[in-house]
Design a protein with these regions (language model features):
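Pyridoxal 5′-phosphate
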Residues: 1-382
Length: 382
């Protein structure tokens, strides 16, 4: 039985061509550190790392200075660094009712430490209610953190309007792009995003364990480094150096991961995000169209592909969703994710809490035949 991978919302598979080989080559043929020594190999590795930073800035529309592209282990660490680095007791934080636990759990920790937290409501499709969101802003509001696209329903937030509201009130905006980066083109400067947190292993088609955030100077001025340690620079200082990116990159970076991510970014440049997005949206619309009219399932989020990415949750009204997910693999070879998807806030907003849903997420290698097979399986099991 052929395996059909529809769990790209958890991690992309397969990775972009050449990612694994680039990582293997670095480990087996290069192996050096960066910013710690002065011989040629380490200088070449540092140059390769700089190129990846430049590619990230270009991809996200972040400006010309690659030092504002910071590497971390992924979007979760990046969000923690932004939220805990920018907020202090007495400050006010706003998140949305669609957030992943990568935002909700740090927010809960901050609330226990004296930061006021508000959850901005969203409509039944998961779209932020802009007027109600703006009314939550107070003189003490320091930071807004929002996901760009939902890992449950695929709902895309109106980030341009959100950015304009934040700028009008002088509030910093940080964005969780885990389900958006690599899926469609956007420009963080035009959207007025102060920090864009990303992960390498989902839409960017890179390896696990590498991600980061790209920020502007306003966010940099607001941040205190969350992690301190060696950087290979200004070693006489017992404080973190003021220069970027070293200020936020204590310890040895994940160099094999960075090299793999670099190959993935070049692949995205060669193929083109617009082409990938058009294909993903066509498959998403095919998927949604094939399920319309089935009264035994419910699909949270926008009714068609417009306004969402290729993440489709299905709530089986007559069956246990966990049992359906098991049968999808056992009978049809279809790999999905079932449950709350680390996003209880989103499921409460969408009306699928506490049961959760079965999530199907489309990738860059997903075919029409695979989508059709999933549609048939859903009808069979519903």
């Amino acid at each position: 039985m052929k395996q059909i991978y529809l769990d790209n919302g958890a991690t992309s598979f397969p990775k972009a061509p050449g990612v694994g080989q680039a990582m293997k080559d670095y480990i087996e043929k290069v192996g050096v550190n960066v910013n710690r020594s002065s011989y040629r190999a380490t200088a070449e590795a540092a140059l390769s790392t700089l190129t990846v930073r430049e590619d990230l800035c270009r991809l996200f529309g972040a400006g010309e200075d690659p030092s504002y592209a910071i590497f971390t282990s992924g979007v979760t660490m990046s969000l923690n660094m932004i939220m805990k680095g920018a907020l202090h007791p007495g400050d006010h934080l706003i998140i949305s009712g669609m957030e992943h636990n990568a935002v909700a759990r740090p927010a809960t920790q901050l609330e226990a430490a004296g930061v006021a937290v508000s959850i901005a409501p969203c409509d039944g499709d998961g779209v932020l209610r802009l007027e109600e969101f703006e009314k939550l802003i107070t003189p003490k509001t320091r930071l807004v953190v929002m996901q760009y696209a939902s890992n449950v329903s695929g709902t895309i937030q109106p980030m341009g309007e959100i950015g304009a509201i934040c700028r009008r009130h002088g509030v910093l905006l940080a964005v969780d792009s885990a389900q958006a980066a690599g899926h469609f083109a956007f420009d963080m400067r035009k959207l007025q995003i102060d920090a864009l947190c990303f992960t390498g292993h989902k839409g960017l088609l890179g390896p696990s364990g590498i991600g980061g955030f790209v920020m502007n100077e306003e966010m940099n001025k607001a941040l205190t480094p969350l992690i301190a340690g060696g950087t290979g620079s200004m070693s006489a200082l017992l404080e973190m150096p003021p220069t970027l990116p070293d200020r936020y990159e204590a310890g040895t970076p994940n160099l094999p991961g960075i090299m793999g991510l670099g190959v993935a970014l070049r692949y995205l440049q060669e193929v083109g995000l617009d082409a990938l997005h058009r294909r993903e949206m066509a498959l998403t619309e095919r998927f949604l169209s094939g399920l319309r009219g089935n009264e035994h399932i419910r699909i949270p989020g926008p009714a068609d592909a417009k306004g969402r990415v290729g993440v489709i949750s299905v709530d089986f009204l007559r069956q246990d969703n966990a049992e359906v997910a098991f049968q999808l693999e056992e009978q049809y070879g279809i790999l999905t994710r079932c449950g709350l998807h680390c996003a209880p806030l989103a499921h409460k907003t969408l009306g699928s809490y506490p049961e959760g849903t079965v999530r199907f997420s489309i990738g860059y290698t997903t075919t029409e035949e695979e989508v059709d097979a999933a549609i048939r399986a859903i009808h069979d099991l519903a």
